Amino acid sequence: VPFTNRSLAAREAILSAARARFTEQGYDRTTIRQVATDANTDPSMVMRYYGSKDKLFAAAVAVDLRLPDLTDVPDDEVAGLLANHFVTMWRDDDDGPLTILLRSAVTHEDAAERLRAVFANQVTVMVRQLLGHGAETDLRAGLLSTHLLGVALSRHILRLPPVARLSDKDLVAITTQIVDHILTGPLPVKRAAKTGGRERRTRRS
């Protein structure tokens, strides 16, 4: 049965209240009753629309990283484009789904799994399209995700002063250098990235 305008508004109010609670308190401390009170509705309505706290959380943290299309981007511009994209995205998402997910992932395994899935399904796929398939490519994708999540955690959750004080411009410049090395630099590990018996090389060799 299609939702009416009234029910759609109620769902959105519940979702907005849930995001605010998850941002402020994290997953474990947030209750359906609190969300219902904040949304000016009854807990039964929250359950009717979303089914459970887990499903409400999943709806609140549905994330699309909106990754740029790198198909025709010159090799020497890829790192800068990605750095600018992620620095801007984290800034604009300060109280949004991605920040909620990152904050909750520290203490809640389901949130951690959802965050892993976001980066595996989006960042890893992007890096594979850029560099080809192989163990080394997946390692580079993992290192890229590690750096991007670490910067976000330090700047927007922990608010470590040296990182939090950086201007967006300076952070983009620093991140560009790191991302460039992660994607194209040598990796001092004893593992060859092979696909079909042939070693894969990075996009820029």
Residue ranges and their predicted role:
Residues 86, 98-105, 144-148, 152:
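Short alpha-helical scaffolding segments that buttress acidic/His motifs in well-ordered protein cores
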Residues 112-116, 130-182, 186-195:
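Hydrophobic/aromatic-rich alpha-helical bundle segments in the mid-to-C-terminal region
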Residues 61, 90-121:
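Amphipathic alpha-helical segments used for helix-helix packing
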Residues 57-64, 71:
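Alpha-helical DNA-contacting segments of helix-turn-helix folds
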Residues 49:
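Residues in the recognition helix of alpha-helical DNA-binding motifs
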Residues 66-102:
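Hydrophobic alpha-helical connector segments
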Residues 1-44, 54-55, 198-204:
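Basic, helix-initiating cap at the start of DNA-binding domains
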Residues 15, 80-84, 120, 124, ...:
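An amphipathic alpha-helix signature
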